[in-house]
Structures are given as structure tokens and as C-alpha cells.
């Protein structure tokens, strides 16, 4: 009988250990946040070769054109890019996963149904052209409108410190717009974020992207 109870106890211990490992695995995987569709536009003053390298504190999951050790393209003032095979692109695209935290100390609480108007106004303040803003909105609008409300914060150092851009030749103006959002069922109070952008002068680089952040 003693041996029987020992076997049962041993089985319980194994089951508990397995359950704990599964729980820990679930918690660890839930902290991974995906940076979705950051795209990079290059606008030199004259046609020239440009190299772009990512210094990303995470794992790249998709790039187009293929990233390899970086991108090297011929960029034109209107933003058209051509690689060494002659293939033309509108922008450089990448996605990645990371486990760093985003800053929601300031931002906006926006009703899902008001997302389009909010983005049009916010992206203009952040320096995107109408074409760039349109591409941002058509990608993110369906996700934002699906929620009752969204806490939205445009990331600054919390993003750029973990996702650096190394560009040669060095651009005169860099505009990086990265939107982190958290769905919520009700309106939340949050200090309003001030939005601005540098003037576009000389060789200008623009990047936009976003993610649904873990509410933590």
C-alpha cells in the first residue's frame, strides 16, 4: 500500500511539473510583441545608391526585398527604389518580434469608429504625406475599428532605441512613426500626447509601422 501511494504521489508531482512548464511557456510566449509592417521610404534629392541596415533588438520574421546583411538600392527623389537586379519597389519592408515594453504614459483613447479621422489628423501632425498616411491607414484601420476603443501611443525612444536605422549616405531628415495600441472595452483616461515632426529638408527617410501591445 505504501508503494502504491508513493507511485500516486510521484505521478502528481510529474503532472504538476508539466503543468508549471506549460504555464511558464505560455506566459513567456505572450510577452512577445510583433512589430508589424514597418516600411521605409527613401527620398534623396537626386538619384543615388543608398544602403540601409537595421539594428533591431529582436528577431526579424519577414523582409521584402530580402534583407540579408542589409539593403542596397538605387533611390530616386520620387521614392522609387531599384535593386541590383533591376526590380522596382515603393519601399523597404520588414517585420519582427521582440519582448521589450512600449511606453503608454501618454497617448490617446480613441473610439474604434473614430479611428480614420484620428489617424488622418495624427499622421499629418507626425509628418507623413497624404500617400504615406493612406498606406498606413488602410493597413491599420480594420484592426482599430474592430475594437470598441483603443489606447494609442506613438512611440519615440521606446521604439527607436530598440530598432535603429543605419543609413548611408546619412539622411538630412528622418521621420519615424510607430503606433502601439491596446484594445479596451471602455474609454480610458490617459495624458494626451503632443505630436510634431521635423521639416522635410534634403535627403528624407520616412518609416511607419505599429503593433498591438500587451496590456501587461
Which residues make up each language-model segment?
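Eukaryotic extended interaction platforms
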Residues: 18-19
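Protease-labile, long low-complexity intrinsically disordered regions enriched in Pro/Ser/Thr
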Residues: 23-216
Amino acid at each position: 500500500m505504501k508503494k502504491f501511494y508513493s507511485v500516486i504521489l510521484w505521478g502528481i508531482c510529474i503532472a504538476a511539473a508539466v503543468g508549471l512548464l506549460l504555464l511558464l511557456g505560455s506566459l513567456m510566449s505572450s510577452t512577445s510583441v510583433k512589430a508589424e509592417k514597418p516600411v521605409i521610404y527613401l527620398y534623396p534629392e537626386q538619384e543615388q545608391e543608398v544602403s540601409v541596415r537595421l539594428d533591431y533588438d529582436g528577431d526579424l520574421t519577414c523582409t521584402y526585398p530580402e534583407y540579408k546583411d542589409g539593403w542596397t538600392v538605387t533611390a530616386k527623389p520620387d521614392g522609387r527604389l531599384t535593386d541590383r537586379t533591376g526590380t522596382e519597389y515603393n519601399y523597404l519592408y520588414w517585420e519582427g518580434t521582440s519582448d521589450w515594453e512600449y511606453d503608454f504614459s501618454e497617448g490617446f483613447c480613441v473610439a474604434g469608429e473614430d479611428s480614420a479621422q484620428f489617424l488622418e489628423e495624427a499622421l499629418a501632425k507626425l509628418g507623413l504625406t497624404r500617400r504615406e498616411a493612406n498606406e498606413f491607414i488602410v493597413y491599420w484601420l480594420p484592426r482599430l475599428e474592430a475594437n470598441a476603443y483603443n489606447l494609442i501611443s506613438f512611440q519615440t525612444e521606446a521604439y527607436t532605441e530598440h530598432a535603429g536605422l543605419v543609413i548611408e549616405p546619412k539622411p538630412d531628415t528622418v521621420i519615424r512613426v510607430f503606433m502601439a495600441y491596446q484594445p479596451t472595452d471602455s474609454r480610458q483616461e490617459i495624458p494626451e500626447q503632443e505630436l510634431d515632426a521635423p521639416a522635410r529638408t534634403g535627403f528624407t527617410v520616412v518609416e511607419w509601422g505599429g503593433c498591438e501591445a500587451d496590456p501587461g
